[in-house]
Amino acid sequence: MNYDQSNQRDTLFERLSGCFLGGPKPDYLPGGRTEALRKLNAYDPASYGRTRNHIEGTVSQLSPYLRHGMLSLIEVRDHLRSKFPNDLARFEEFFRQLAWRDFFEKVLTWYGHGLDEDLEEPKHGVARSSRIPLDVLSGDTGLPCIDGMLSDLFDQGYLHNHARLWFAAYLCHFRGVRWQEGARLFRQYLYDGDIASNSASWQWVEGTFASKPYFMNKDNISNFSSRKWCNSCKVKCPFDADYPTLQHRLFAGSSAPLMSQAAKKAEPINNMQQNTLALPEDIAPLPPNTDLIWVHDAAMSWADECVAKNPNAAVAFIFNEPALKAEPWAYHRLAFVTDGIDDLFKNLPNSTKLTLVGDPVERLTTLAHKLGATTIHISEHPNPWVIETADQLRLKFRVLVHPRATLTVYPPEPKRFSRYWEKVAIQVLGHRPSSPKRKHQ
């Protein structure tokens, strides 16, 4: 008997009503491992090192697929090594950036939920607000650069890494908002929104995971955007100063004078209007199975050991209803993940494949009992939610956590990327790096 729910998208989104922001768009990014492999095969990092800091640079845009485990860092590295075996310099800088993702995952592994709070004392004494100003939430700050970044975030679910740092610096330092609020906004809208890279990068900008806070000036934005926004800007630019002047302005006292009147009336982002989520139907009768695979949203690949080694097990993906009600995703994020589920299920031989909505522990427990399953398989990941779900399931079932190969082995506490890179570069590159040290910029 085959039980496959991969073609029930409309019903799924009805059940997810209230768990997402916005609605369907004609040009959202397609998800799934098939699309990830297509993008990887088409990518040439030859000019990456030279253009990566420009917002029109030749970046890979593989990060959404890496974040959801549709591709692995090792697969990307090995593919490029094989494709360009005699041109190591071609991808050295790109591999360094892959290592940032590996580094941030190690940060999450080490700190867990601690990554949600300041990892270090702030390097300044400026107070921060827990409210995002309304003009920011509406993408109407009056600054063409910031509004352009917000338009890309809200409508496209993508921001170039340099633009992410600019916006984070703007929100934290020029508007005086806690980094956690910005990290939450990015998680909701970015296709690659996650805990590790996202929260650690925001802390790097704030200066709670770096030796000093990051900020930019007008020249920096202008130079790396080809004056895309500056040419049309008619307002007094808050970034138009040299770095010493901005440093004094931002960190010698309160940043409140740079906040608009809208900020005084701002509401927390979690007060955004939401619909009520309908409870899912009871799970229908299923063919018995002793093994159940829980596919979480960071392990969506048919090459993942967890599914590859268990072709006869039942497979389930659970949309985490409590988490999505607390922090709804943009519609395009859910559509991307749904694409990933469809693509995964089409490429798995397993006969029972389900997509469910609810509390993962409750739904997996109910499903396991329906199947008569005694063993639940999970792919390893440092996300605390994955770890905690596995721990709760162990109270009732045999849980097998399948190990995930990582790009590097680095036992020490991951405090600074520069120290990490000195130790792991040869693991990533296969040789000692030839280029100078790079900053996370």
Specify the residue positions occupied by each region the protein language model found:
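Trp/Phe/Arg-rich N-terminal binding region typifying the photolyase-homology
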Residues: 1-96, 100, 110-123, 151-155, ...
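Hydrophobic (often cysteine-bearing) scaffold residues that line and stabilize catalytic clefts
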Residues: 73, 91, 142, 159, ...
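Active-site-adjacent helix/loop patches that line small-molecule binding or acyl-intermediate pockets
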Residues: 103
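Active-site-proximal, glycine-rich beta->alpha crossover segments in alpha/beta enzymes
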Residues: 118-135
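Helix-hairpin-helix/helix-loop-helix acidic hairpins
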Residues: 131-153
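Conserved catalytic-core segments centered on acid/base and nucleophilic motifs
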Residues: 150-182, 186
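C-terminal, helix-dominated tail/subdomain
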Residues: 190-258
